[in-house]
């Protein structure tokens, strides 16, 4: 159970394949994330699929950004952020999520969702 785990070592990725790890201390590992990502990507109802898949799990901001990138438009990304907000392990990286959005109004909405003043 990710909530109760002692902080894990941050993965630096497989240098041979130049795959960058999206894992951070306290978040699910890359393999588990890829499973959730693919399930969500292949689902017609992405938000509800994701909501079920991340029960009792924490994600890194990088993992959240990858999931949000399944959508093109900020409004859809913000809906996904609403699902993800209580599952973010590295809250110090919220700015990465906010800055990924295209419009100032979307950035402000993301701050509101994340509880950033």
Q: Model regions: which residues?
A:
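General marker for long, soluble alpha-helical cores
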Residues: 1-117
């Amino acid at each position: 159970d990710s909530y109760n785990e002692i902080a894990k070592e941050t993965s630096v990725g497989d240098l041979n394949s130049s795959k960058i790890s999206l894992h951070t201390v306290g978040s699910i590992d890359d393999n588990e994330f890829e499973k959730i990502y693919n399930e969500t990507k292949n689902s017609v109802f992405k938000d509800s699929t994701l909501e079920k898949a991340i029960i009792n799990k924490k994600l890194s901001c990088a993992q959240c950004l990858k999931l949000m990138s399944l959508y093109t438009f900020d409004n859809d990304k913000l809906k996904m952020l609403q699902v993800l907000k209580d599952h973010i392990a590295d809250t110090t990286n919220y700015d990465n999520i906010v800055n990924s959005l295209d419009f100032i109004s979307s950035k402000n909405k993301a701050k509101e969702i994340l509880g950033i003043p």
